[in-house]
Amino acid sequence: MSGSNPAVSINKRKVAPVVLAILDGWGYREEIEHNAVRQASTPVIDALWHAYPHTLIEASGADVGLPDEQMGNSEVGHLTIGAGRIIQQELVRISNTVKENKLITNPALNQFSQSLKKGGGTLHIMGLCSDGGVHSHINHLCGLIEWAASKGLKSVSLHLFTDGRDTSAKSANKYINTIEAKIKSTGVGEISSLCGRYWAMDRDNRWERTSKAYELLTDPRFALSKLSAAESINKSYQEGITDEFIEPVRLSSSFLKDGDGVVFFNFRPDRARQLVKALKLKDFDGFERKNRADIDVLTFTQYESGLPVSVAFPPEPLNDLLGQVISDHGLNQYRTAETEKYPHVTYFLNGGIEKPLKGEVRHLVPSPRVATYDLQPEMSADELTDSCIKAIDSGIYSLVVINFANPDMVGHSGIMTAAIKANEKVDSCVGKLLNSIGKLGGSLLITADHGNSEMMIGPDGQPWTAHTTNPVPVILIEGEKRKLSGYGNDIKLRQSGGGLADLAPTLLHLLNLPKPKAMTGKTLIEPINLPKKPNLIPQPAY
């Protein structure tokens, strides 16, 4: 599937492109043990690392606007790359609000509670119950329970999605204990259902998964379990089912009915959209909805423009983004990824802008229809590479951005052999890309948005399925037609202090475009020490 843009300008002379290849989840860790990056056979990237300018940059914590020691993720990573500056992320923004007890003054939440009390409906709070900090945080859920208590809401049902992907695979009981303690201390709420995120938080249009979560929430005939939340989780473990895949289970008689209200506390949109659309959209064709309730929905952040929901923390607009600079200078750009990472190279890289910019073409390659990607670690990398090469060969794009999902999506499986195969496939694809770029004299900048597959076993000896706080590599292969004036063959990359926010300024430097003042990141290309001469033409400050 490809997106077209009639505003793309066609130039008879082929353009030497600058290509940004994002190897999603390809972090750097020196140790070889349990490291699917180091253990993979990657002759292309190994050779480029040794032969061309390279460095390591930070992709987690404060360097991407997250709390210290908080692992990075694809949304935050691409947002930071595209913005060229460090942005306070939603995790920090909402955490500060909860910490300062300011949920009680949030206008959207207060209007929501007033409407709910007036109608006498039940408040249903749902979302990912963990401290992973990628899609949600348990502190936000605790804050919501306290908010509900402060507003005098008596009928409160919690529908909790178990993690096991951004956390340890069998850690759900720890979070359930925290929530049960909060329920006891406030006297508000009950855990009404449990469901693994595999079912409730799909983002790949696997509607058969979303429908199972939907039925759990809406079907009055859904079987009521006699087990407690903890007992249900332990039963799943006994059956070999970890947190991510826990089957939907109803723990109380509460389900969504007309006049009820839902607060969805995930702050990251991509894995919350499908379920919200199923719950709220009138025109919906993902699956047949047998039990549609007339409910109000409030989401913590804007999951998608145009959704008929209230938003507690609306987006803060960003300007002077990488894509906008390219577009404003009349240049064409191409963005491509497979399904799992398509929103990241488009929506997130553009700072939350839904529609393509002038001169921007987007191309989606479908991800394979498998239960988990360790079953097909190559994913759709070959098809993705072939489509990107066609775009490069067309000679009409100044900037090309491609995301390889394999290291991250297969890394999440925790299966070492599969992650190694995934990384080897990406390495071979980078080689094909480089050959195509070289024919036009273009430049290639290789990096990652966060770490993952470089650590497959955690400190507890269990499979590590989450992201990491490790740095990520950057390699610059400068093309003959993209040589920066004055550097010759002596171009070097900054060896310390770099982060994802420095990538947009670096790309603009390679494209010989000015960096906007709003971009506080700095080019990773080291300045050259030219002898002082009179009347030199001032150069842009990157």
UniProtKB/Swiss-Prot annotation:
Q: Which cofactor does it need?
A: Mn(2+)
- How and how many cofactors are bound, per the record note? Binds 2 manganese ions per subunit.
Q: What is its EC number?
A: 5.4.2.12
The keyword Isomerase belongs to this UniProt entry's keyword annotation = yes
Any GO BP: glucose catabolic process
Q: Which GO terms describe its molecular function?
A: manganese ion binding; phosphoglycerate mutase activity
What are the binding positions for Mn(2+) 2 in this chain?
24, 74, 449-450
So, what pathway does this thing act in?
Carbohydrate degradation; glycolysis; pyruvate from D-glyceraldehyde 3-phosphate: step 3/5
For this protein, the record's InterPro entries field holds: Alkaline_phosphatase_core_sf, BPG-indep_PGM_N, Metalloenzyme, PGAM_B_sf, Pgm_bpd_ind
Cite the entry's keywords alphabetically: Glycolysis, Isomerase, Manganese, Metal-binding
Annotated residues that bind substrate are located at 135, 165-166, 197, 203, 268-271, 341
Instruction: Tell me which CDD domains the record gives.
Output: iPGM
Quote the Pfam families the UniProt record gives. Answer: iPGM_N (PF06415), Metalloenzyme (PF01676)
**Keyword NADP: yes or no?**
no
Reaction(s) this enzyme catalyzes, per UniProt: (2R)-2-phosphoglycerate = (2R)-3-phosphoglycerate
- Which residues are involved in binding Mn(2+) 1? 408, 412, 467
Q: Mind naming one GO cellular-component term on file for this protein?
A: cytosol
Instruction: Give the top-rank taxon of the lineage listed in the UniProt record for this protein.
Output: Bacteria
Active-site residues annotated for this sequence: 74
What family does the entry list? Belongs to the BPG-independent phosphoglycerate mutase family.
Q: Which HAMAP family match?
A: GpmI
Q: How does it assemble?
A: Monomer.
Q: What does this protein do?
A: Catalyzes the interconversion of 2-phosphoglycerate and 3-phosphoglycerate.
Looking up PANTHER family in the UniProt record yields: 2,3-BISPHOSPHOGLYCERATE-INDEPENDENT PHOSPHOGLYCERATE MUTASE
Protein name (database record): 2,3-bisphosphoglycerate-independent phosphoglycerate mutase
